[in-house]
């Protein structure tokens, strides 16, 4: 048994050894074959790499050669350009050198000519000086001979001759001046008449006269009771807020608004219109509507001023001057509407200035602004012409226009040609039949003076002259004026009116002191 095992083991060992030897031989054979193939592939790769390297080398050499040729060509072209430029510059330099040489030759020749001219002039000057001396000697000798013959010295003869010539010239000049003056007077009178007639013919005017009453039409008389209010409280509130007199009488379907200030009358009329349309009429609502209406009317005044300036072709007016022009619509002068009058004067001035060959635009501007002093709200103690001139200066109007405004009533001296034109046209506009009513102007001035007198007292807030100046209603500051002082103030104002003013009949002075306490519930 053991022998069999030994035999099997021996056989296995021998088989393994033979297998190892055979495997080694086969492996060596395969390895040699792979090694040979690898060497062949390596040689092939090396050859291909060498071929590619050779080809790349040739390409790079070609590129380098082409780049070199390109640079060479550019260099040659640049060199040629620079050579050409150098050649051109050299030619220019040569030309300049030639020009300079010619100029130097010319200058040299001229210097020589000038030297010769100097010599000739010097010699001629010497000759002239000698002749001058000879003539001077001859003149003196002739003068001496004439003095001996005439028995007069040279100065005496000269003075006698001058006196004779002066007398003849004075006589001729006097005759000539008289003739020219007579002709100028005849021509000026004729031309002035012609210009005024042509100006009047070219101006179409309306014959409009203002009054102190406005009529407010209503649909039915039932509304009158609402306007009057309980115990007249509504109408009193309306009169106190607007400063006019509201007359509610038997006139059918009409309420009369009386007041000398057209702005106040217009505020009252518009306020009544709004209140009637709204239907709510009570003191608080009246104050609210009057305030809004006054603000709206102020905007309308500016719009009227702007529209007037545009219609007349006047540009560049200061906004405050435009406001004053708009206020003219609600102001009358001797019963004549001030805006209509100013527009009329502006057109007349433009026409007359164009006939005289002057600046029509400047004349038109001066004509429109000549009465702005009448509508200035503060109305200081100055003539309206001087006040208008100061306002025009304040708002940068030209000196010519300022003088025309200030001189149109001869308060100052006229310095420009536009000033007499404005004065004449103002007179033409006011002198038309029916254009003005002096009584109306005096009446309005008396009412204004009455209000100004009351406003001069301390504590007075507002003052309105109503009922054609027969009543003066004064609103005072409740904090500064007590009930006792209100009576004293009324007496003092009445006494001052008696001393300083002239008036028919009597004037009722009413001082109104109103105390209001307002709080808000939140």
Swiss-Prot record:
One of its GO terms (cellular component) is plasma membrane. Residues 338-431 form the HD domain. One of its GO terms (molecular function) is RNA endonuclease activity. Its EC number is 3.1.-.-. Keywords: Cell membrane, Endonuclease, Hydrolase, Membrane, Nuclease, RNA-binding, Transmembrane, Transmembrane helix. It is found in: Cell membrane. Disulfide bonds: none annotated. InterPro entries: HD/PDEase_dom, HD_domain, HDIG_dom, KH_dom, KH_dom_type_1, KH_dom_type_1_sf, Ribonuclease_Y, RNase_Y_N. Its main location: membrane. Residues 212-272 form the KH domain. It is a single-pass membrane protein. GO terms for biological process: mRNA catabolic process. Gene3D superfamilies: Hypothetical protein af1432. The chain crosses the membrane at residues 3-23. PROSITE patterns: HD, KH_TYPE_1. SUPFAM superfamilies: Eukaryotic type KH-domain (KH-domain type I) (SSF54791), HD-domain/PDEase-like (SSF109604). The keyword Hydrolase applies. Endoribonuclease that initiates mRNA decay. Belongs to the RNase Y family. This is Ribonuclease Y. It comes from Cytophaga hutchinsonii (strain ATCC 33406 / DSM 1761 / CIP 103989 / NBRC 15051 / NCIMB 9469 / D465). The lineage of its organism: Bacteria, Pseudomonadati, Bacteroidota, Cytophagia, Cytophagales.
